[in-house]
Amino acid sequence: MAVVSAPAKPGTTWQRESAPVDVTDRAWVTIVWDDPVNLMSYVTYVFQKLFGYSEPHATKLMLQVHNEGKAVVSAGSRESMEVDVSKLHAAGLWATMQQDR
């Protein structure tokens, strides 16, 4: 939130003062981790059903999980990421959330 200072004299202009940045305003992300249990086709299916991703996008994320060990699958508020992690756990996937850097 910005604070506006009133002009000191007639004919002078006002100046905005920046408020300090609150680090809790940063976005959160949901990360899916590779696991030895779920089939790649199932992980792709879960991404499509839970997040509404197209098959090519869901496949790209699944391959990132498979090849790199993890992938960011969603971003947003802390509360919405908690919901996403919970849904992924219910689907049997390994997922965590963290504050985006």
From Swiss-Prot:
Listed transmembrane segments: none
InterPro entries, alphabetized: ClpS (IPR022935), ClpS_core (IPR003769), Ribosomal_bL12_C/ClpS-like (IPR014719)
Signal peptide annotation: none
Pfam families to which the protein is assigned, alphabetical: ClpS
Gene3D superfamilies, alphabetized: 3.30.1390.10
Annotated disulfide bonds: none
GO biological process, one term: proteolysis
Role description: Involved in the modulation of the specificity of the ClpAP-mediated ATP-dependent protein degradation.
Record note on quaternary structure: Binds to the N-terminal domain of the chaperone ClpA.
Family: Belongs to the ClpS family.
Protein name: ATP-dependent Clp protease adapter protein ClpS
Species of origin: Mycobacterium tuberculosis (strain ATCC 25177 / H37Ra)
Protein encoded by which gene: clpS
